[in-house]
Swiss-Prot record:
The gene is MSH4. GO terms for molecular function: ATP binding; ATP-dependent DNA damage sensor activity; DNA binding; double-stranded DNA binding; mismatched DNA binding. GO terms for biological process: female gamete generation; homologous chromosome pairing at meiosis; mismatch repair; ovarian follicle development; reciprocal meiotic recombination; spermatogenesis. Residues 7-20 have a biased composition (Low complexity). This is MutS protein homolog 4. Highly expressed in testis. Also expressed in the ovary. Involved in meiotic recombination. Required for reciprocal recombination and proper segregation of homologous chromosomes at meiosis. SUPFAM superfamilies: DNA repair protein MutS, domain III, P-loop containing nucleoside triphosphate hydrolases. It is found in: Chromosome.
């Protein structure tokens, strides 16, 4: 918003009236994050581009006055006359508090690739003159009835700080979503790759990242800063002085702002100094960019440990197309697109965050699955909930606006508060219909959400609102409709002057309509009154059935625009009446705003129930979306054991974009056979299969049904993929170098609870080196209990099963079809996965045969390949002892698995064990019949 300039004075000095020169008494106290801040205690300013007054404090948290040497406007500058916003006695002091600047302009920051530095959060300089432009929008002060920001546009600000010295690697993070008044704190130890930090930031998808200036110093930046800037090229960076990362101040902010019901977070973070330091800097910065403060005891603050959810790194999220399609970079053909049938922005955001951070707690997942199952079985519950949920607005953004207290009383701030109070009334009136829709639900989670709707505070807040706000004031589409709702929101007889102002406004609107009607009669034209938020009232006319004399409108009409056969224009008299209308509106908004602020101050003590309502609505919306997705396909409820078993599973995204249902395949991975080597020709389905496994795993861990006839999953705490093999020109990385970086990341971070999917590792270098690298990587991963699926063209790797009994070989089948027209064989892809090594040898050469390569070249390639293969494979046969140990190993793992997971009755279990014993006896003699000497 525009801030009229004033003369620069010391904040601690008494204000002087520009017109009279008389000394005014200082303004009363202002809120500052729940604290009362007097003009004498306003923070000091240090501006790089202007000389700073002596005496500026260098200690964190010091509050002393200073003045800027930047040019100032004339002493008699003042706001426009007639406005109820901006010409109050406190105007000068408020402007001094809000007109602060950064130490470097945004343009210079862009040129040097270093972020601009915020020397102190507040400044008396003029932001117009300092050249600083804020990238973060002011949320909620839009007069429009629609959201200021779309549901998925970035709106998160993150502060990141790292320990120094022996504490290097200890990371503190604090983030706030401008559309959701919730602060999330994190503190964790990271390694030198900073994988956890990068992954966490990718999930948050920040609009802006704040760091300490000592971490980003030109020529001496930390490794963390370098890695973040490399991975987030399109994110804005801002640095502030290290002293504002103050853990003591951070703890004070939490004590002052956190709602009592969430105050247990204080116990969790008391000794977590780095996340406290991050939240101190974050809140100070948000106060600056939003030009507002949060009301005391109004924020939800929580601590999230890294162990509460599964980790999916950003490269894997891109490879699996969780949110963005790799072809057109949209969210249509993605896992999000498959599951997203949400009706509210909050539900959509919740689905997105769950896909990127799946749950790891089996009990919580099963509670969600119980809900989805009940929604599928009870159509009345499903459609009843869906009908009510679709009527909710963005409750999270609504809360975000309600809990902020603007530093300046502007027209936009007033209009926003009035609008959001109407939205709040609309939201609270949906609580009873939501309760009615849920009254017959049975599952524990749905019953818990139903219980949260029984909170008496919903009724208390709604009753307080209805004592002030008209019963028929409601949310309506269209800017003119919402303007009318805002004007007449407050009941009559509460403020006599407000009633008079509204009558005046009504008369002006009637006069405008009458004037346009008279103009239509005067010129015999079909004129009609129209309205837009930008132009106010104007005149429109269509020329379908009339002919204009000389193809011109009367000279009285000005600002004429034409779109097809429709004219839009105004007149000098209408412009004057619009000005009168706007002046009347400002009076109405001012008086309504005063009443609304008083009402909101009485609501803040009950605000916790609104957070519960927001959580309930977004969760119900997501669960309904899961149920909706199930009705469109034959998904099945997953089970959770220590085995990954999928019967006839298929790729969910491929199903959505294909005309025919994808080919289904089985998957079976256990602790005894936790390493699958998958071979097959190019385009046989290896990459699609790997992605399918990961997508099904994620769907199961967020509480969704999965595309299969039966499915059982082991909880994966990390999901890694190495699939993409494109060169990265921006970072000067070849295919091979990119492969090595990705596989190194996996090896550094994988553990026993990981799901690892690797596709064609080593193809970026020569065959010998590729095989050597793959073999070494396989041996390392085999030392873990992670579930690994390794797709490769190196058939030599298949013989590793002779050394490691937990290796299983699988392959994709192909069929050979005679091409009668060209008298050659063609490959028919079945996309079916089978056990054992592929019978296809040299399928690359077969693909070359059907290409345009000369036959002589293909023949030479075959001869050379045969010689190389004979040399490599001549000593890779297993001994009888290896085969015997392998058989014993598989029997033991089957017995352990049966003991852990069997749900068979005693008789069936006895039969199963008997059959298992027979199979072992049948297999065991064969191992003894293998000749001792296998050398040719």
């Amino acid at each position: 918003m525009l801030r009229p300039e004033i003369s620069s004075t010391s904040p601690s000095a008494p204000a002087v009236s520009p017109s009279s020169g008389e000394t005014r008494s200082p303004q009363g106290p202002r809120y500052n994050f729940g604290l009362q801040e007097t003009p004498q205690s306003r923070p000091s300013v240090q501006v790089v581009s202007a000389s700073t007054c002596p005496g500026t404090s260098g200690a964190a948290g010091d509050r002393s006055s200073s003045s800027s040497s930047l040019p100032c406007p004339a002493p008699n500058s003042r706001p426009a006359q007639g406005s109820y916003f901006g010409n109050k006695r406190a105007y000068a002091e408020n402007t001094v508090a809000s007109n602060f600047t950064f130490g470097a302009s945004s343009s210079s920051a862009r040129d040097t690739n270093y972020p601009q530095t915020l020397k102190t959060p507040l400044s008396t300089g003029n932001p117009q003159r300092s050249g600083y432009k804020s990238w973060t929008p002011q949320v909620g002060y839009s007069a429009s009835s629609s959201s200021a920001i779309s549901a998925h546009s970035p709106s998160v600000i993150v502060a990141v700080v790292e320990g120094r010295g022996l504490a290097r690697g200890e990371i503190g993070m604090a983030s706030i979503d401008l559309k959701n008044p919730q602060i999330i704190l994190s503190q964790f130890a990271d390694n030198t790759t900073y994988a956890k930090v990068i992954t966490k930031l990718k999930i948050l998808s920040p609009l802006e990242i704040i760091m300490s200036n000592t971490a980003c110093a030109v020529g001496n930046s930390t490794k963390l800063f370098t890695l973040i800037t490399e991975n987030f090229k399109n994110v804005n960076f801002t640095t502030i002085q290290r002293k504002y990362f103050n853990e003591t101040k951070g703890l004070e902010y939490i004590e002052q702002l956190c709602i009592a019901e969430f105050s247990t977070v204080l116990m969790e973070v008391q000794s977590k100094y780095y996340c406290l330091a991050a939240v101190a800097a974050l809140l100070k910065y948000v106060e600056f960019i939003q030009n507002s403060v949060y009301a005391p005891k109004s924020l939800k603050i929580c601590f999230q440990g890294s162990e509460q959810t599964a980790m999916i790194d950003s490269s894997s999220a891109q490879n699996l197309e969780l949110l963005i399609n790799n072809q057109d970079y949209r969210n249509n053909h993605t896992l999000f697109g498959v599951l997203n049938y949400t009706k509210t922005p909050g539900g959509s955001r919740r689905l997105r965050s769950n896909i990127l951070e799946p749950l790891v707690d089996i009990e919580t997942i099963n509670m969600r699955l119980d809900c989805v199952q009940e929604l599928l079985q009870d159509e009345e519950l499903f459609f009843g909930l869906q009908s009510v949920i679709s009527r909710f607005l963005d409750t999270e953004q609504l809360l975000s606006v309600l809990v902020q207290i603007p530093k300046q009383d502007t027209v936009n701030a007033a209009e926003s508060k009035i609008t959001n109070l109407i939205y709040l009334k609309h939201t609270l009136e949906l609580v009873d219909p939501l309760k009615i829709a849920m009254k017959n639900c049975n599952t524990p989670l749905l019953r818990a959400y139903y219980g949260s709707l029984e909170d008496k505070r919903f009724g208390i807040i709604l009753e307080k609102i209805k004592t002030v706000i008209n019963d028929d004031a409601r949310y309506m589409k269209g800017c003119l409709n919402m303007r009318t709702q805002k004007c007449y929101a407050v009941r009559s007889n509460i403020n006599e002057f407000l009633d008079i102002a509204r009558r005046t406004y009504t008369e002006i609107v009637d006069d405008i309509a009458g004037m346009i009607s008279q103009l239509g009669e005067k010129y015999s034209l079909p004129l009609r009154t129209s309205f837009s938020s930008a132009r106010g009232f104007f005149i429109q006319m269509t020329t379908d059935c009339i002919a204009l004399p000389s193809d011109q409108l009367p000279s009285e009409f000005i600002k004429i625009s034409k779109v097809k056969n429709s004219y839009s224009f105004t007149s000098a008299d209408l412009i004057k009446m619009n000005e009168r209308c706007q002046e009347s509106l400002r009076e109405i908004y001012h008086m309504t705003y005063m009443i609304v602020c008083k009402l909101l101050s009485e609501i803040y003590e009950h605000i916790h129930c609104l957070y519960k309502l927001s959580d309930t609505v977004s969760m119900l919306d997501m669960l309904l979306s899961f149920a909706h997705a199930c009705t469109l396909s034959d998904y099945v409820r997953p089970e959770f054991t220590d085995t990954l078993a999928i019967k006839q599973g298929w790729h969910p995204i491929l199903e959505k974009i294909s005309a025919e249902k994808p080919i289904a395949n089985n998957t079976y991975v256990t602790e005894g056979s936790n390493f699958l080597i998958i071979t097959g020709p190019n385009m046989s389905g290896k990459s699609t299969y790997l992605k399918q496994i990961a997508l099904c795993q994620i769907m199961a861990q967020i509480g969704s049904y999965v595309p299969a006839e039966y499915s059982s999953f082991r909880i994966a705490k990390q999901i890694f993929t190495r699939i993409s093999t494109d060169d990265d020109i921006e970072t000067n990385s070849s295919t091979f170098m990119k492969e090595m970086k990705e596989i190194a990341y996996i090896l550094h971070n994988a553990n026993d609870k990981s799901l690892i999917l690797i596709d064609e590792l080593g193809r970026g270098t020569n065959t010998e080196e590729g095989i050597g690298i793959c073999y070494a990587v396989c041996e390392y991963l085999l030392s873990l209990k992670a579930f690994t699926l390794f797709a490769t063209h190196f058939l030599e790797l298949c013989h590793i099963d002779a050394l490691y009994p937990n290796v299983e070989n699988m392959h994709f089948e192909v069929q050979h079809v005679k091409n009668t027209s060209r008298n050659k064989e063609a490959i028919l892809y079945t996309y079916k996965l089978s056990k054992g090594l592929t019978e296809e040898k040299n399928y690359g050469l077969k693909a070359a045969e059907v290409s345009s390569l000369p036959p002589s070249i293909v023949l030479d390639a075959k001869e050379i390949t045969t010689q190389i293969t004979r040399q490599i494979l001549q000593n890779q046969r297993s001994t009888p002892e290896m085969e015997r140990q392998r058989a014993v190993y598989h029997l033991a793992t089957r017995l352990v698995q049966t003991a852990r997971n069997s749900q068979l009755d005693p008789d069936s279990l006895r039969i199963y064990l008997s059959n298992l014993k027979k199979k072992y006896k049948e297999d065991f003699p064969r191992t003894e019949q293998v000749p001792e000497k296998t050398e040719e």
